[in-house]
Swiss-Prot record:
Protein name: Exocyst complex component 6
Subunit record text: The exocyst complex is composed of EXOC1, EXOC2, EXOC3, EXOC4, EXOC5, EXOC6, EXOC7 and EXOC8. Interacts with CNTRL. Interacts with RAB11A in a GTP-dependent manner.
Localization (cell): Cytoplasm; Cytoplasm, Perinuclear region; Cell projection, Growth cone; Midbody, Midbody ring
Keywords: Cell projection, Cytoplasm, Exocytosis, Protein transport, Transport
GO biological process: erythrocyte differentiation; exocytosis; Golgi to plasma membrane transport; intracellular protein transport; vesicle tethering involved in exocytosis
Length: 804
């Protein structure tokens, strides 16, 4: 039962498999058949049985179908057999017709072949003509290219190459000759680049050689333009200036018209001679090279090369020769080369596009300007000649004006000119120091003698001197100053003129120029003239008379300073009402010189007194005085009287101070002589002789050698000596010791130390001269008194030391 159940379940499965085999592609039969074997054991046998049964069923159906169509097939075969004879007939007819057609078409075929052959030839000819018409323009353009190359029309040649490559070659690119032509174009381009670069190098070398001439031409044009502007300005100032005199208006206008006319004539003559930069340099190579590299699409290479080479040339131009500072021609050559360089760059800037830009030229100029300033600052420091420095300044101004006309900033150059101006002033100061020294060396330091009205007017024309009393005097007469005063005044004015020459054309206002001139003049007065005066005053050969004249000279020079201020105001055309921040320091300069001269007078006077005092030859052990003053002292007093007579031309205080100083110094010298430590013994006779000399000094002081002293002021210079000598002459020790320290003391000016020193010298003398005097009562009493006084004086000296 189990087996029968399984068999019943297998049968539907086999039917499904058979249906699948019949309905699917044979490529998929394998998996279907595998499922038969994957089933129950002996399933494939049952499947085979089922398959055989299925095959038998299909055979039966085929047999049934064949039986059904068999009669129709037989009828069809019978019909075919009937039409076979007709088909044979038709074939024979077709073959015959074909043969007759073939025979008839042979001639047509031959004629047709001839026609075809002619048509092919005609087509080929047409094609050749078309191709030749296509190639001829290419060949003509290539021939044109060769002609342009031979005629050195390289930019046109490049344009022709572009046309060949973009228009003509694409039309005939299939031909071999086209490829050959195309292969030659890169080499032609390289040749053009090399040739144009060679031309550019020649151009760069040419402008390097012509920089001098280009710069000289540009600077000449700028100078002519400036001269014309100055002439017009001067004419305007002459016609409309505030300081013109009405009576001279017509004359000034006529002169200004003549000046302007001459300037215009010179301008016209120079214009005919002056060449432009285009006349001096052929710029076509740089134009061609620029166009060629632009056409080649390599503008950057060309620009970089040009700028690199020009920067190298700029460095060479900016490097001056070591001897540039020796002559003005060296500076001129240096400036013209630089101007020529930047004039060329400015021209290139305006005639090309992109080769040189304003930013590039400004950068190059700033680099050059820093180098120029460093060079000028270094080399100008070697210039010791003010004329050379002035010419250098004029060159720098023309140089700056020229480049400013081309749009370059030159403010730093004018700032440099202010530095050079300081150096110029230093060279001027050195030069005028020599001039002043020569004037002082040649001066005789005596008042200027005048013998006639002409001589008087000549001096007045040189120096602003006004003295109504002197004018009233008859000839011959004398100016109070010496001949150096008008010469110094003239030279100060010459210095101002020289300083003004540098200040011109600095693009500064009249007020600024006026201020600069005043500062320069102050330097001349305070540094140079003051130094020369001080050196003169300190020279050993300058005596008291010369010193007195120097003081008088400085007084008149000081008074002339206001005229120098007016002179500066006039030449700078500044209004008198303008408040000047800078004044001339003549007052302090000449006051210092006078003080130095006064001090030197005091010093020399004291030295002269010392010389006389050194001639003193006292016999310090003499028993009695000679009864008359010493000869050296009388000579000294006579000398002082003559000197103080010369001092009458000095200001009162100076003469009084000199007289008081001389008396005080004489008193001090006499006191030092009396108290000299090397002097061991002094007799009473020597003291009496010394007293006679002091009396002469007091008489001299009381004679009023210099007017202006009140009462016995001058005699007070000898008060210390007088009281000391009176103390010893009267031997009034009791009064001195009793009144010491009292304001009303008779011997208030006697110093205990001085009294002690002199008393000890006399004590030693008494001991030496009176060896046996101790046996006499009076001498013993005197000796005891001296010893007692000495002890008391020593006590006073000790008390003074402790108090101090």
């Amino acid at each position: 039962m189990a087996e029968s159940g399984e068999a019943l379940g297998t049968v539907p499965e086999h039917e499904r498999i058979l249906q699948e085999i019949e309905s699917t592609d044979t490529a998929c039969v394998g998996p279907t058949l595998r499922s038969v074997y994957d089933g129950q054991p002996n399933a494939h046998k049952k499947f085979m049985e089922k398959l055989d049964a299925c095959i038998r069923n299909h055979d039966k159906e085929i047999e049934k179908m064949c039986n059904f169509h068999h009669q129709g097939f037989v009828d069809a075969i019978t019909e075919l057999l009937k039409v076979r004879a007709d088909a044979e007939k038709l074939k024979v007819q077709v073959t015959d017709t074909n043969r007759r057609f073939q025979d008839a078409g042979k001639e047509v075929i031959e004629q047709t072949e001839d026609i075809i052959r002619c048509r092919i030839q005609q087509r080929n000819i047409t094609t050749v003509v078309e191709k030749l018409q296509l190639c001829l323009p290419v060949l003509e353009m290539y021939s044109k290219l060769k002609e342009q190359m031979s005629m050195q029309r390289y930019y046109s040649a490049l344009k022709t190459m572009e046309q060949l490559e973009n228009v003509y070659f694409p039309r005939v690119s299939q031909y071999r000759f086209c490829q050959l032509m195309m292969d030659t174009l890169p080499k032609l381009r390289e040749d053009i680049k090399d040739i144009s670069m060679s031309d550019l190098k020649d151009f760069l070398e040419s402008i390097r050689k012509h920089s001098d001439k280009i710069g000289e031409t540009a600077m000449k044009q700028a100078q002519q333009q400036k001269s014309f502007s100055i002439a017009v300005q001067k004419q305007t100032n002459m016609r409309f200036g505030k300081n013109m005199h009405v009576n001279n208006d017509r004359t000034l206008e006529e002169k200004s018209d003549i000046i302007l006319k001459h300037t215009l004539e010179e301008e016209a003559e120079n214009d005919e001679e002056v060449l432009t930069v285009q006349d001096l340099v052929d710029f076509s190579p740089v134009y061609r090279c620029s166009h060629i590299y632009s056409a080649l699409g390599d503008e950057e290479t060309f620009e970089n090369y040009y700028r690199k080479q020009r920067k190298k040339q700029a460095r060479l131009v900016l490097q001056p020769q070591s001897s540039v500072h020796e002559t003005v021609d060296g500076y001129r050559r240096y400036f013209t080369q630089i101007v020529g360089f930047f004039v060329v760059e400015d021209h290139i800037l305006h005639v090309t596009q992109g080769l040189v830009t304003r930013a590039y030229t400004d950068e190059l100029w700033n680099m050059a300007l820093s180098k120029i300033i460093a060079v000028l600052r270094a080399h100008s420091s070697y210039c010791t000649d003010p004329d050379l420095v002035l010419e250098l300044k004029n060159l720098i101004v023309i140089f700056a004006d020229t480049l400013q006309g081309y749009g370059f900033s030159v403010n730093r150059l004018f700032d440099l000119l202010f530095e050079i101006r300081d150096q110029y002033n230093e060279t001027l100061l050195k030069k005028w120091a020599g001039i002043f020294r020569d004037i002082f060396e040649e001066d005789n330091y005596s008042p200027i003698p005048i013998g006639s009205e002409e001589e008087y007017k000549m001096v007045i024309s040189k120096f602003p001197f006004q003295d109504p009393d002197l004018e009233k005097q008859s000839f011959p007469k004398k100016f109070p100053m010496s001949q150096s005063v008008p010469l110094i005044y003239i030279q100060v004015k010459e210095f101002i003129y020289a300083s003004l020459k540098f200040s011109e054309s600095l693009h500064r206002s009249s007020t600024e120029i006026d201020d600069m001139l005043r500062k320069s003049t102050n330097l001349l007065l305070t540094r140079i003239l003051s130094s020369c005066l001080l050196n003169l005053i300190r020279k050993p050969h300058i005596g008291l008379t010369e010193l007195v004249q120097i003081i008088i000279n400085t007084t008149h020079l000081e008074q002339a300073c206001k005229y120098l201020e007016d002179f500066i105001t006039n030449i700078t055309n500044i209004s008198q009402e303008t408040v000047h921040t800078t004044r001339l320091y003549g007052l302090s300069t000449f006051k210092d010189a006078r003080h130095a001269a006064e001090g030197e007078i005091y010093t020399k006077l004291n030295q002269k007194i010392d010389e006389f005092v050194q001639l003193a030859d006292y016999d310090w052990t003499m028993a009695e005085s000679d009864g008359r003053a010493s000869g050296y002292l009388m000579d000294l007093i006579n000398f002082l009287r003559s000197i103080f007579q010369v001092f009458t031309h000095l200001p009162g205080k100076v003469a009084q101070t000199a007289c008081m100083s001389a008396c005080q110094h004489l008193s001090t010298s006499l006191m030092q002589m009396l108290l000299d430590s090397e002097l061991k013994q002094i007799s009473m006779g020597a003291v009496q002789q010394f007293n006679l000399d002091v009396i002469q000094c007091e008489l001299f002081a009381s004679s009023e050698p210099v007017p202006g002293f009140q009462g016995d002021t001058l005699q007070l210079a000898f008060i210390d000596l007088r009281q000391l000598l009176d103390l010893f002459m009267v031997w009034d020790w009791s009064t001195y010791l009793a009144d010491y320290g009292q304001p009303a003391s008779k011997y208030l000016r006697v110093n205990p130390h001085a009294a002690l020193t002199l008393l000890e010298k006399m004590k030693d003398t008494s001991k030496k001269n009176n060896i046996f005097a101790q046996f006499r009562k009076n001498d013993r009493d005197r000796q005891k008194l001296i010893e007692t006084v000495v002890k008391q004086l020593r006590g006073l000296v000790t008390g003074m030391s402790q108090h101090m």
